[in-house]
A protein has these predicted regions:
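Glycine-rich phosphate/ribose-binding loops and adjacent secondary-structure elements
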Residues: 187-191
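Conserved alpha/beta cores of soluble small-molecule-handling proteins
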Residues: 1-177, 181-184
């Protein structure tokens, strides 16, 4: 198991211990959810389709009108270096989720850029592949595409959290399926 004191996070050009990773309390990503993100994963220690994820991150940045202080290539290099710093913490059977987040920053400041790795809980979830995962259709609806583009990965996931709480009240371990306002299937709350 990866310990927080052993792993590193990239924050604004520096690689810091996870336990020392902080952002300002007045950051818009914290106070208003004013941030974008993308998530990719590794397979056998290699990041899968990183360039495509970075492209999507920049599409979300454009939608939210946040200017990245880093180029696509700089983020790609930073992500690879972060993985190099953290890969030794995993066994050869383990992999990472890699999260890239860019906040607007505080109202009088610059965007904050965070890249961090989280071990994939593959062993804990192996039972899902054998026996399935309990699901329920939530009464909580996905944010309307008229209010917020579903193509942009933004830090607005409170409806997913509420849907998961509803699913947990339905059955322990259950995940939620969210519909749109017209009753159409949109997506699951995550696993």
């Amino acid at each position: 198991m990866v310990r927080i004191e052993d792993s590193y996070t990239f924050i604004n050009g520096e690689y810091v211990s996870d336990k020392d990773a902080v952002i300002p309390i007045h950051d818009g990503g914290f106070t208003r959810g004013d941030a974008v993100f993308d998530t990719c994963r590794t397979f056998r220690g290699e990041i899968y389709k990183l360039e495509e994820h970075i492209d999507r991150l920049f599409m979300s940045l454009n939608y939210m009108q946040i200017k990245s202080p880093y180029t696509k290539n700089e983020l790609i290099k930073a992500t690879h270096k972060l993985l190099e710093l953290n890969n030794h913490l995993l066994t050869e059977k383990d992999d990472y989720w890699v999260f890239l987040r860019i906040t607007r920053g505080p109202s009088n400041g610059s965007p904050n850029v965070i890249i961090h790795c989280v071990p994939l809980p593959l062993k804990e979830r192996s039972e899902y592949y054998r026996s399935g995962l309990p699901l329920m259709i939530s009464s909580v609806r996905r944010t309307s595409h008229e209010a917020l583009s579903p193509r942009a990965k933004v830090n607005q996931y409170i409806n997913f959290n509420l849907a998961d709480l509803e699913a947990q009240n339905y059955e322990e371990g259950a995940k939620a399926i969210l519909l749109d306002q017209n009753g159409n299937l949109t997506e699951g709350s995550g696993t």
